[in-house]
């Protein structure tokens, strides 16, 4: 099954409770606007739990918010879970556990059994042309209500480009890097 990361966006109502809510809403999509703890809990339940099913959130693009119980992991049916998302290799999220420690030549800490070991068996980073992605976002985001095309362009540069650079910095943490073809290369 595919476990989409978008369901772990912090709901808009919770973002509006942040101390600087206008900034949090504007930067939605940045690492701190996702619920990494909920993702970690669900990965723990899937990987190390014994529940026959685990309900997982999705993202309702029509509402612009996560939707609880949108996906179901069934232990009896799903032998492979592909977890996809932007910040899964983000070092502050601690989702790679021993995988990254082994890659970096570090030894497991003796007696530390709570280090998220085993969330991912293998990680793949799909690298895309940054400029092409930024331009696609500018076009896609023009449907966001309340923003002019110029405001969308500014937001993409200030928010989405920064987020993309954050993602790119985690590329070396993956076991495999695959280069995505641009439109001109795939024709």
Protein language model regions, located:
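Conserved catalytic segments around the Walker B and adjacent sensor/switch elements
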Residues: 1-4
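Receiver (REC) domain switch/active-site residues of two-component response regulators
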Residues: 6, 121, 175
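Conserved RecA-like P-loop NTPase ATPase core
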Residues: 6, 39, 82, 124, ...
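Conserved nucleotide-sensing/catalytic segment adjacent to the nucleotide-binding pocket
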Residues: 9-63
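Alpha-helical scaffold elements adjacent to nucleotide-binding pockets in ATP/GTP-utilizing enzyme cores
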Residues: 38, 42, 133-140, 155
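Short gly/ser/thr-rich secondary-structure transition/capping motifs
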Residues: 58-68, 83-86, 156-161
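ATP-dependent NMP and nucleoside kinases share a basic, alpha-helical "lid"
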Residues: 66-140
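Small-molecule kinase domains that catalyze NTP-dependent phosphoryl transfer to phosphate-bearing small molecules
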Residues: 110-115, 139, 143-187
